[in-house]
């Protein structure tokens, strides 16, 4: 069974919509400890560390009975938006969100989501989680933004939605109407590439 090592509601909803059985446990890994400058590699490393931090503490988690035996998969993800070579995480305030959207209006950027799937077996008797395989990949999607007036940007920023999203926008939320088109995996822009997960979870 699957453990989602993330507090993301978007990823949770994607899994629920696909009727994938899982439980959600947020990773407590400190992201500031990673100094990788390459955005593509950074997303991948953060996804691994999130999944790995859970795998190392699996014996201390309160898991349902069905997780006490057999195969377990721990999924870690991290999304970073890249705009003209610069990494855009979550805006720190409304002013920063507005400035970013002014720059992104009529332009495009890349949403990189690092994926790590740690597969193993947990023996509840010995309290040992034995890793059998680690699968990692960063999936990238190109996001095109509409040309927006200042009042549209302000109206969106005032909803506070941009403050909780990598890149300052949510495709599945209010921000979806400001996205012109997507090239690449659609669900990846929401934080999880479902085609990648299907390929690696059920092989």
Curated annotation (Swiss-Prot):
An example Gene Ontology molecular-function term: nucleoside triphosphate diphosphatase activity
Any GO BP: nucleotide metabolic process
Cofactor: a divalent metal cation
Key words of the record: Cytoplasm, Hydrolase, Nucleotide metabolism
Subcellular locations according to the entry: Cytoplasm
Active site: 78
Domain of life: Bacteria
Main localization category: cytoplasm
Reactions catalysed, as given in the entry: a ribonucleoside 5'-triphosphate + H2O = a ribonucleoside 5'-phosphate + diphosphate + H(+); a 2'-deoxyribonucleoside 5'-triphosphate + H2O = a 2'-deoxyribonucleoside 5'-phosphate + diphosphate + H(+)
GO cellular component: cytoplasm
Enzyme Commission number(s): 3.6.1.9
Pfam families cross-referenced by the UniProt entry: Maf
Function: Nucleoside triphosphate pyrophosphatase. May have a dual role in cell division arrest and in preventing the incorporation of modified nucleotides into cellular nucleic acids.
Protein family per UniProt: Belongs to the Maf family.
Protein name (database record): Nucleoside triphosphate pyrophosphatase
Organism: Prochlorococcus marinus (strain AS9601)
